[in-house]
Amino acid sequence: VQHLLRDDPRVMQLSTIAAVAFLIYAPFGYIPALGDWLIAAVADQTSAALAASGYPVNFSAWNTMERNGFRTEIILACTGIQSIAIMLGVAWGVPSTARQKVAGFLLVFPTIYILNIARNVFVITAYSEQWFPYLPAIAGNGEFGYESFFWAHNVMAELGALIFLVALAYALFLILPELGTLADSLYRLYRGEVERVLRPKAPQSGLQP
């Protein structure tokens, strides 16, 4: 906070990234009509991808798909908008040329959106086909078949998303070298404060050996 109050350019740059990410996410997160539109679009595209993969589903509600008696609801978190907003905030929140901004958009938006559809297809198929009915004591919640959803959604998909986002961030660093400069400056800025918290100085007694 103290660096922000001093208008430190490095912290102001980080604030710009956060602001850009929020401005991208906010319309979908806080305007129900836009959020529902995005959810419906992702649900329809996920259904089409499932049908093309040989696992057709039925809609029991506008955003809920059913197969083999197992229902999966698509919510805003299933659309990938959070990841898109964060990564576009990173890509657009640093000084760059128009060409770099376009390249960042083309790298981030279609890649995350398409892979998010693939993620939904994997989770729904794994759940409805009961691919991973393992360790119910750990993964179960009392609902029949939930274990497959847990392993597919909470473990495999999350781990895959983490690996992918790291790779995407690396690609952004190649397109926008300014990100590397910002990351290094932020590391140097906060390293000393973290060290002071983790290794506080011992109080001096006034006695010398």
Predicted feature locations:
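Hydrophobic N-terminal alpha-helices or hydrophobic patches in metabolic proteins across all domains
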Residues: 1-209
